[in-house]
Structures are given as structure tokens and as C-alpha cells.
A protein has these predicted regions:
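Proline-centered turn/helix-capping motifs that create local helix->coil transitions or kinks
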Residues: 163-178, 247, 365-371
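ALDH superfamily catalytic-core signature
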Residues: 241-244, 286-382
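Terminal low-complexity tails and localization/encapsulation signals of metabolic enzymes
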Residues: 2-87, 120, 124, 172-200, ...
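Residue-level signal for inorganic ion chemistry
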Residues: 82, 118, 140, 162, ...
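Rossmann-like NAD(P) dinucleotide-binding subdomain of oxidoreductase/dehydrogenase enzymes
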Residues: 174-322
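Glycine-rich loop-to-alpha-helix module at the N-terminal edge of alpha/beta enzyme cores
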Residues: 83-172, 183, 362
């Protein structure tokens, strides 16, 4: 027989809640004003922000030609401390329209660029990310709240995807088929879709964008990206790096645009825009259903990466120490904020009490600090 951990009452019945409660407790013990300048922002505490081209005051829309921001103001915060780090002036619907106009301008020339050349530009984006990996990983940790090693892992995912896409650019398929007409053959050739919209979530502000962008660009599409509002600095920093590579190759900046803004205005406009042939959305299942319905209603295409309801089943013959370490990180990794987070733990009755006691002990040594969540990996069964 097996028992579900969700049957328990107490601190281990909801693993994500434990982390959230610990974060809230830690926030209450921190002095938010420490390290702030005259602006009231903690920007100067983090030198890597300036190295990524960020400022205390940032514009949130790259239309392919210039940085603009005519929408509402947003304050980027460190979720581990609550301190304000920098400000962002969001784009509005008019800024969005400028992005689309510049994408239209860039579309034909990018489409006609040979796929291996597009792939080489994506490869260069990967190289640029390598040069700024440590700073960008630190920014992801700062703005999203995950540990720095996970932030670095996100950047590496983008780098790996850029490498993969570069190779794929030389393997885009096509066929030569026989024809019933003499001295004729039929050639199959895949064409770019055109303009693409990307909406990414706060919990993986770099990797998800990287997966989409790497493949999208080698296929010859132009794109507009709306990252999550709470990770706007990551979106701006990444876009600056990509725009620099595109400019170095004398290509039109409208290939890859960014418009940070509220989901209710910029996001909804993007979803409803018939000029965007495909929408890639990462977020909750409930919002994903709405996106799918809206886009399919205009005969558009969608790529949806939504929520999960994940379980671990541990039998009595399992390697318990490995299972314990895996369960803790599955529940607490990424501060518990991901679609693959562990929600249900099912244990064989023979190991149930021992495993639960060990898991409670493991949570007691899991520390929440100002900027990182440290997970203890050297754990023993009680």
C-alpha cells in the first residue's frame, strides 16, 4: 500500500507553501533601505546591471530601431528582499504597432537570407550570451528569486539551443518528388511563417525565450516578445545582447523586437493580432486555454507550455537518500515556482513515517537568505 503526503496535516502538507512562508518570514527581517542611493533604488548594489547595459531608469520597448516606452511605469524588485532595483517604462499599444511595422520592414530581407547565414547569426547570439553568462545568471537570480546556479543554467539552456539551432539551419528539410510530366520534377520547399509572437513567463525569463528565438530566427521569421512584467530587466538585457549581434551583422533590427507591457493591453493585443501567424505562450493552464481559443478563432497557430500537476512515487525498494534529495529539490527548486514543481508525493507505507520525518528535517536545514535559496544535499534518513 502507498500513502499520499497530501493526507498529512502540518508544515509538509504543502511543500510550495513552506517555501513561500519562509520567504515571507525572511522578508520581515531585512532592512529594505540598506544600500539604496538617493533615487531610492538599490541599483548601485549590483554592478552586473550596468555591465548588461541596464540603468536605474529603463525603456521597455525595442522596436528594432530605438528603445522607447510610452506606457505605464514599473518598478523592478528583488523578490527575496522586496527592495526596488530599477524602473522600467513599459511600451503601450502604439509602441507595439511600431514594432510590427518594423518587423514588416525586416521580414522579406530576413526571409531571403540563406538559412545557414541565419543560423550563424544565432550562433553568434550564443557566443554573446557566453560572454555575459555570469552577469545574466546573476540578474535572473536577482529579479526572479531563484538561486544563481539555476539562473546560470537558464543562460546555458539558451546557449545550447543556439548551438542546436545553428546546426538545424543546415538541415531544414525538403523533397524532390517525381512528376508524371516528362522531364519535370516537383520540389518541396518550406517557407517561413512570417511574424511570430512570444509571451514568456516570469519563472524562466531567459530559457523559454531562448528556445523560441533560436528556432524561430533560423526558420526566417521575425518576432515580437513580451516577457513577464516582473522579469522585465531580464527581457531588456537579453534583447540588448541580441540586438547588438543583429546590428553587427548589418541586419534589420526589426527581426527581433520587444514590447514589455501589461498583459491586459500589450499582451491581449499581441494574442488577437491576425498579423502574427503563431503565438508561443508559456504560463498557466487557465490563461493558456484562453490564448488557444483566441488564436484558433482567427485560424492562427499556437505553441503552449502550461502548468503541471507532478507526482513522485517512492517504493520501499528505492534508494531513499536519492529519492529524498530529489523530492526536496523538486519541491523547492526555482523557489517552487515552475510547471515541473512537485505537488504530490506518494510513499510506500513501509517507508512512509521514516521518509516524512527525514523530509521535515531536510526542510529545517533549508535556508532562505536575501538573494538565494540554499538547498542542503547531504541528507541522511532519520
Amino acid at each position: 500500500m502507498v500513502q499520499s503526503l497530501s493526507q498529512l496535516q502540518g508544515p509538509v502538507s504543502n511543500m510550495s507553501f513552506i517555501i513561500g512562508r519562509a520567504v515571507a518570514k525572511a522578508r520581515g527581517k531585512l532592512a529594505f533601505s540598506q544600500g539604496r542611493g538617493l533615487s531610492g533604488l538599490a541599483f548601485d548594489k549590483y554592478p552586473f546591471l550596468a555591465r548588461l547595459g541596464l540603468k536605474e531608469d529603463n525603456l521597455g520597448c525595442w522596436n528594432g530601431k530605438e528603445w522607447v516606452g510610452n506606457g505605464v511605469s514599473h518598478t523592478a524588485k528583488n523578490p527575496a528582499t522586496g527592495e526596488s532595483v530599477a524602473s522600467v517604462k513599459f511600451g503601450d499599444v502604439n509602441d507595439y504597432e511600431t514594432c510590427l511595422a518594423n518587423m514588416e520592414e525586416a521580414e522579406e530581407s530576413w526571409m531571403m537570407t540563406p538559412a545557414p547565414v541565419r543560423g550563424d547569426i544565432v550562433r553568434q547570439i550564443g557566443l554573446k550570451l557566453r560572454d555575459h553568462k555570469d552577469d545574466l545568471g546573476a540578474l535572473i537570480s536577482l529579479e526572479m528569486g531563484k538561486i544563481k546556479s539555476e539562473g546560470l543554467g537558464e543562460v546555458q539552456e539558451f546557449i545550447d539551443m543556439a548551438d542546436l539551432a545553428c546546426g538545424m539551419s543546415r538541415q531544414l528539410p525538403g523533397q524532390v518528388l517525381p512528376s508524371e510530366r516528362e522531364e519535370h520534377a516537383m520540389l518541396e520547399c518550406w517557407n517561413p511563417l512570417g511574424k511570430i509572437g512570444i509571451i514568456s513567463a516570469f519563472n524562466f525569463p531567459c530559457a523559454v525565450h531562448g528556445w523560441n528565438t533560436s528556432v524561430n530566427l533560423i526558420c526566417g521569421n521575425t518576432q515580437i516578445w513580451k516577457g513577464a512584467s516582473s522579469s522585465s530587466l531580464v527581457s531588456i538585457a537579453q534583447t540588448k545582447l541580441i540586438a547588438e549581434v543583429i546590428q553587427d551583422n548589418n541586419k534589420n533590427g526589426g527581426i527581433a523586437t520587444l514590447c514589455q507591457g501589461p498583459g491586459s493591453s500589450v499582451g491581449q493585443t499581441l494574442i488577437d493580432d491576425e498579423r502574427l501567424k503563431l503565438i508561443s505562450f508559456t504560463g498557466s493552464s487557465s490563461i493558456g486555454k484562453t490564448v488557444a481559443s483566441s488564436v484558433s478563432g482567427r485560424f492562427g497557430r499556437t505553441i503552449l507550455e502550461l502548468g503541471g500537476n507532478n507526482a513522485v512515487i517512492v517504493m520501499d525498494d528505492a534508494d531513499i537518500e536519492v529519492a529524498l534529495s530529489s523530492v526536496l529539490f523538486a519541491a523547492a527548486g526555482t523557489a517552487g515556482q515552475r510547471c515541473t514543481t512537485l505537488r504530490r508525493l506518494v510513499l510506500h507505507e513501509k517507508i512512509y513515517d521514516k521518509f516524512v520525518n527525514s523530509l521535515v528535517s531536510a526542510y529545517k536545514v533549508t535556508s532562505v537568505t536575501k538573494t538565494t535559496l540554499s538547498l542542503t544535499t547531504n541528507m541522511q534518513m532519520c
